[in-house]
């Protein structure tokens, strides 16, 4: 794969008003994508966004670029990333575009693409788009210019799709659920899905103003959700991030239920119902408690690099259907082509309803190991992880932790940091081992 100039692992992303998140670059990107994506099909591209104020500016610029290349744009407005993937497929569009920076603050934004089948664009297509970005723009003839339409019922279509993944003979009647939408793209979707399935819903994070997305709310800050669950005596709480591809849950006692626990609940229920295909893909950061719990059920487990795109790659390689990260990206390929927070929450709720068990009860089978995470800064130059003393200590600790913990040492790809992670049944021991490793790295 050629080295990328503009596209990162998740499209183009950055601070609004600074290259490449500017209207002039977005226009050029729309044009370049339009030139590459134009085929003999519908010549239509679906455009969705989250609730950032900059989304208005960027979608207009993208639409102008697409039109100049002869492609029409179909706007769906604020819409979760997985919804855009789904709607791109059902509208038979050439591609889907999402304007979002996921869990980042409002002053960041990004642009990423889905192929016609709702999956990440192939590398060769992204490379072809990049090559055009450095070329002067040309335009189709006036009678070939693209148009723009707005799809007013997109939210309703996705709500019905989500509800259709929930067992037809089940209901959420009797459940009180607090739903935190991070003032993001799920604000008009998730509460309605839960209500229409019968739940009593208490909303927080559902009043976006363009500036408050992910601000002290959502999957990256669940303190408000925990308080709301306890205050309202709810059965559980659900938090999504700004673009709806990540989920964290809270049980009735206010305890956090992370992506590893959610993944286990879904996997166990799929096994019970005979719908589990293959095994489960986690990441290098997945808790050892998840691995052990899956092993007790004889469910195969493998680890991908950190990042939902790497989880997806492993799933496709193994032809498995279920994977995710402890941060809350949960991919259920039987239901959607990308991580989908609403679908994941419905999978957990279906398991609760099937067994008439609380979320707290369902998490008991996957006791998470205490995990210590430390960052150590170093002065460029030699990689401390190649130092003989550091390697010897790491090997010694790994030997001591066999069967009851693990360590993970990795160099940051963006800054001069070594990330140290130690998991152990004994929290005190985990902290001790982590500090020993940090000391060795600092003294290398």
Swiss-Prot record:
**Pfam families attached here?**
PGM_PMM_I, PGM_PMM_II, PGM_PMM_III, PGM_PMM_IV
Give the GO cellular component terms, alphabetically: cytosol
Tell me which residues bind Mg(2+): 102, 241, 243, 245
Keyword Magnesium appears in the UniProt entry: yes
Where is the catalytic site?
A: 102
Share an example GO biological-process annotation for this protein: peptidoglycan biosynthetic process
Processing and modification events after translation: Activated by phosphorylation.
List GO molecular-function terms, semicolon-separated: magnesium ion binding; phosphoglucosamine mutase activity; phosphomannomutase activity
Q: What does the record give as the reaction this protein catalyses?
A: alpha-D-glucosamine 1-phosphate = D-glucosamine 6-phosphate
| Cofactor binding comment, as recorded | Binds 1 Mg(2+) ion per subunit.
Tell me where on the tree of life, at the top rank, the source sits.
Bacteria
Report the cofactors: Mg(2+)
The answer to whether UniProt assigns keyword Metal-binding to this entry is yes
Could you list this entry's UniProt keywords, alphabetically sorted. Answer: Isomerase, Magnesium, Metal-binding, Phosphoprotein
Family statement drawn from the similarity comment of this UniProt entry: Belongs to the phosphohexose mutase family.
- What's this chain's function? Catalyzes the conversion of glucosamine-6-phosphate to glucosamine-1-phosphate.
What HAMAP family does the record point to? GlmM_B
What is the official name of this protein in its record? Phosphoglucosamine mutase
Q: Which organism is it from?
A: Haemophilus ducreyi (strain 35000HP / ATCC 700724)
